[in-house]
Regions:
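Active-site/acyl-donor-binding loops of N-acyltransferases
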Residues: 2-9, 27-38, 102-105, 144, ...
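Intrinsically disordered, low-complexity terminal tails and inter-domain linkers enriched
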Residues: 5-33, 292-313
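Acyl-donor binding region in acyl/amide transferases
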Residues: 81-84, 89-90, 95, 101-201, ...
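Short C-terminal domain-edge/linker segments immediately following a structured domain
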Residues: 71-74, 117-119, 126-133, 208-212, ...
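A conserved beta-strand-loop-helix scaffold within acyl/acetyltransferase catalytic domains
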Residues: 36-116, 166, 175-353
């Protein structure tokens, strides 16, 4: 894996050969017909797959799966040390793609709940290296897990793909392997490969998703149950009573990125868990890529840009709150197809409470998504109580976990499920 995320590799993408035990051609039941041959090829960068092919494989309405998001991750330092992409071909044709993110020193005390972090604190002080583990994340490091593809992954392809994942982990000394935040149907398609390799599953934190379809924001408010509707109107009134505060929606905000990062750090300093921490390079790279339109990009294997269908490219807007000319809050929103994501938030906690800033930033994002005709908007895996009040449903998802060593795998099976389940229960518990 290239450790230089920002530079294009000089060599052609490596090809990962299927092991001899798994022939590329598998006979169908009864031997009367033969299934297509499946092979797996390793790509070093998202740009190594033509944009047109990426958009054919990626979830059409999930903004976190636009190719621009992955190229921005490669250019930044948000947690992973390196990236790779396993491309499944069916009879030579691109059929599915699984992104991989390698973290060689994941800090365990940053990805557990507050109680577990307190228990780990003495170890973290005395032996900090003991809490750093090499880990391979499969799927989207910043979003819900998927295997991008043209359809459900056949069992033969699933076994080959998961086998290649484990070979990749062994080859790069990444002991723990995680298929991160996959929905049940996504894991079901991978089940033949996961079971063959000894993976086990644990429920992860659910996503929150608000189904849309209202004609305007007032219709959305009217659709809420009585108590959340009263609370929403009360919070909107409190915001509008504040002097010199205003909400804007910006499509260009590069000049605000330094202020955004300061507000984002205020939120992250108060976060229970910090698997990923975005940096200025990520925000700028994403802004630059989405502003490029449908033109050719450096390193695009096609170089033409004519494969982009309408809405295929990830778009972004900044829901920004200003006090005078000073940015005091924002919600960074991404759009793709008919889906929206409130990706990351930043706030000045000096006025967040009295202005009900958290709620009002989300209300503005919901209004924006409705105006754009989105079918749904998703928010981060935090602050579940207010998101239930917004009308969001919980989207259940899971981890599939494994280890390249037999003894560590046994220990993981014993210790990790109760720790993750406790952290999940604490995150979902009512706060009032």
């Amino acid at each position: 894996v290239s450790a230089d995320r920002g530079a294009a590799p000089t060599a052609a993408p490596a090809t990962v050969a299927a092991p001899p035990a798994a022939p590329a051609t598998v006979a169908a039941a009864g031997g009367a017909e033969r299934e297509p041959a499946y092979t797996v090829e390793r790509l070093e960068r998202a740009q190594d797959l033509p944009r047109q092919v990426w958009d054919e494989l990626a979830p059409a309405d999930d903004p976190m799966w636009g190719r621009d998001v992955f190229t921005a991750m490669q250019a930044a330092e948000i947690g992973p040390d390196a990236y790779a992409y396993l491309l499944v071909r069916e009879a030579g044709r691109p059929f599915a793609l699984l992104p991989l993110s390698a973290v060689h020193g994941l800090r365990l005390d940053r990805v557990v709940g507050p109680r577990e972090r307190r228990l780990m604190a003495p170890v973290a002080r005395a032996f900090p290296r003991l809490l750093r583990v090499p880990m391979l994340f499969c799927g989207n490091f910043l979003g819900q897990g998927h295997v991008m593809g043209r359809g459900r992954l056949p069992a033969a392809a699933a076994r080959l793909l998961v086998r290649e994942v484990m070979d990749f982990a062994r080859g790069h000394r990444l002991g723990t392997v995680v298929f991160k935040d996959f929905a049940p149907d996504g894991l079901d398609a991978l089940r033949p490969g996961l079971d063959e390799q000894g993976f086990f599953t644990v429920a992860s934190l659910p996503d929150t998703q608000l189904t849309l379809g209202q004609t305007d924001f007032e219709s959305y408010l009217a659709s809420l149950p009585a108590k959340p509707r009263r609370n929403a109107r009360n919070k909107l009134r409190k915001f509008h009573r504040q002097e010199n505060l205003r909400m804007e929606v910006l499509d260009e905000f590069g000049h605000l990125v330094p202020e955004m990062m300061g507000l984002y750090r205020q939120v992250m300093d108060r976060a229970d868990q910090t698997l990923d921490v975005l940096d200025e390079a990520f925000v700028r790279a994403l802004s630059d890529s989405t502003a490029a339109g449908a033109g050719a990009e450096d390193g695009d294997a096609e170089g033409q840009g004519d494969g982009d269908g309408e809405g295929a490219r990830t778009e972004q807007r900044l829901v920004a709150c200003f006090e005078g000319e000073r940015l005091v809050g924002y919600l960074h929103c991404l759009f793709r197809g008919r889906g929206a994501v409130g990706a990351r938030i930043g706030m000045d906690y000096g006025l967040a409470h009295r202005a009900r800033l958290y709620h009002n930033l989300h209300y503005a994002a919901i209004e924006l998504a409705i105006a754009r005709g989105c079918r749904h908007i998703r928010f981060a895996q935090t602050a579940y109580e207010p998101k239930r009040e917004f009308g969001c449903a919980l989207v259940e998802q899971s981890y599939a976990l494994n280890h390249t060593g037999r003894l560590p795998r046994t220990i993981l099976r014993l210790l990790l499920p109760p720790a993750l389940e406790a952290a999940r229960a604490q995150a979902l518990a009512p706060r009032s």
